[in-house]
Amino acid sequence: MHNWLLPEHIADILPATARQLESAKAAMLERFRRYGYELVSPPLIEYTDSLLTNADPALDMQTFKLDDQLSGRQLGLRADMTPQVARIDAHLLAHRQGVTRLCYAGSVVHTRASGLMRSREPLQVGAELYGCYDLAADIEIIELMLSTLAGVGIDAVTLDLGHLGVYRALVREAQLDGETEQALFAALQAKDRASVEALTADVREPFCSAFRHLVDLYGPEAIGKARARLPGLPGIRAALDDLERLAQIFASRARISFDLTELRGTHYHTGLMFAAYAEGWAEELARGGRYDNVGRRFGRARPATGFSLDLRDMIRVLPQTHPSKGIRVRAADLSRLADEVARLRAAGEVVVVDYLGETAADLHCDRELVCREEGQSLEAAPAHP
């Protein structure tokens, strides 16, 4: 086996791509800052009992684990930064009693790629808002998500909205046992009508029919269908009202669709869920939702809403960036020009020392600092070495 081979779905980032990613990341973080979000940087590795706080089997399966040689405890490489940021809000920023806005950008590592063309080392960028139960907080987060995507040229977006409140209200009122609920959850996720019908055969009405209707409750007209076909439970009415209000607010910014069987993150989220899609993309560009009380394990249960995206997944639409043209200085002249080289670099110029007699183009330079009898001179670089 060649020793330069990397694991599947792991790749090096070369200079041109690295410039694109860093430029886009900086622009996103600056946008977050203008909305009042403060940057935090959690560690790449933590004890698994803090990384895996919500009994989420999917996150557990995605987490690389190893033993700590110092403590003997199990460590995990983070697969998602959201629980880490929730820990920071709940524990390290516990003195803050009002709304806290935090953002982050960093690599996470997955045991398996989440899609055929996706990396196992996503560059996760996201924003979280803590301390506000009101729908206004979700509106701010969705607005920030759409604005962030538009900032990298993705403005023809479909905003897909869902709400766990509908499913959970039905499960609670139908009094399903744990085993049936888990199987029904999987069947609804797969939109497997036959399995849903089999699993709800002994469920009393109106809940039997309601679960079966859920399979069809997706698309632009889903809210109207849901009001007509589902029981008028308070939790369901409130969830549908929220979805309808969000659709009205963002109708001018995105194509709106609904999916009341989109239940990914049910161990993680607690209510509203949303995702952004665009033509030509097989999977979502960004995803988020409400995950109230995620900080309970760290001593402070707080309402929370947020979104995240994988910046590496967007590389094909990110604006091209080009390296700044530099100034070449020949190695033989360096000692005599050292002060001027230092001054130019301090002023923000790129100064490249030519050790091998390369062309200015090879060194990405369009000027040359030369030594002449009458003194130093900054000139246009010749095409030849």
Curated annotation (Swiss-Prot):
It is found in: Cytoplasm. It comes from the Bacteria. One of its GO terms (cellular component) is cytoplasm. One of its GO terms (biological process) is L-histidine biosynthetic process. CDD domains: HisRS-like_core (cd00773). The keyword Amino-acid biosynthesis applies. Keywords: Amino-acid biosynthesis, Cytoplasm, Histidine biosynthesis. Coiled coil: none annotated. Pathway: Amino-acid biosynthesis; L-histidine biosynthesis; L-histidine from 5-phospho-alpha-D-ribose 1-diphosphate: step 1/9. The keyword rRNA processing does not apply. GO terms for molecular function: histidine-tRNA ligase activity. It holds the Pfam family tRNA-synt_His. Heteromultimer composed of HisG and HisZ subunits. This function is generally fulfilled by the C-terminal part of HisG, which is missing in some bacteria such as this one. Belongs to the class-II aminoacyl-tRNA synthetase family. HisZ subfamily. Required for the first step of histidine biosynthesis. May allow the feedback regulation of ATP phosphoribosyltransferase activity by histidine. HAMAP family: HisZ. This is ATP phosphoribosyltransferase regulatory subunit. It comes from Laribacter hongkongensis (strain HLHK9). The gene is hisZ.
